[in-house]
Amino acid sequence: AKLGERVGVSESTVVRFATAMGYEGYPELQAALQELVRQRLTASERFNIASEIKENDVLRTVLKNDMRNIRMTTEDLSQKDFDRAVELLLSARRIYVMGLRSAAPLATFLGHYLRLIFDEVVMVQNTIGEVFDEVERITATDVMVGVSFPRYATRTVDCMHIARENGARVIGVTDGAMSPLSVVADVCLYAHTDMASFVDSLAAPLSLLNALIVALSLRRREELSARLRRLETLWNAHGVYVDRGDERLGEPKA
């Protein structure tokens, strides 16, 4: 009704317009427009939105926002797409993982665990030269995982296109069907990242990657179990982790 008033037409005209655009109704059109605007918000605009949060309620607001993102991701995620991503990764000769800017921690997390599960995992580096040097080697027997959320990293999208042109399968981890990753990926896994500030909410994407890693580990159970036993021996021999009884932990605080 408010949109009709603003543009000087009736509510029924707005509904017919939404239907003519291919939407089931105005609410669906409204949601699509909101998503489009959200993707285009600059960091400063996102920060201004955060100013509406009361300072004494920041903790609860942000945590509730992250919980909502995880819940919505759980409800919306396609099990079929998730299963297909698992199969593509299991069939790959080599796996390339790429995520830049705020998505870099997600890509690093995924790459770390994929290297425990698979022998051939390449983390595509962040410098311009190294990015294209790595991606140029991708072949039709490989799989690339591109991770990016608003505002999308141009180089990630470009490298996904190169991988696709080289015949590789491409998996996108992003926020929705309007993402540029959806255009190039063979399969996309969507996670909600609605933010309460200029900071990207990575709670749902991280949970999604957790699920992907666990699914892969269960399919490679025997190989992974043997590798972890060998690694534990090396880790213990070289003191990779601080032991609970290590004096470096210090005395417990009263």
Describe every region a protein language model picked out.
Residues 222-254:
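A short, charged, Gly/Pro-tolerant segment at domain boundaries
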Residues 2-80:
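HTH-adjacent hinge/linker in prokaryotic transcriptional regulators
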Residues 80-87:
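A short, basic/flexible loop-to-alpha-helix module at the beginning of a structural domain
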Residues 87-208, 213-220:
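Glycine-rich phosphate-binding loops that contact phosphosugars or nucleotide phosphates
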Residues 32, 36, 88, 231:
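Short acidic/histidine-centered micro-motifs embedded in hydrophobic/aromatic stretches
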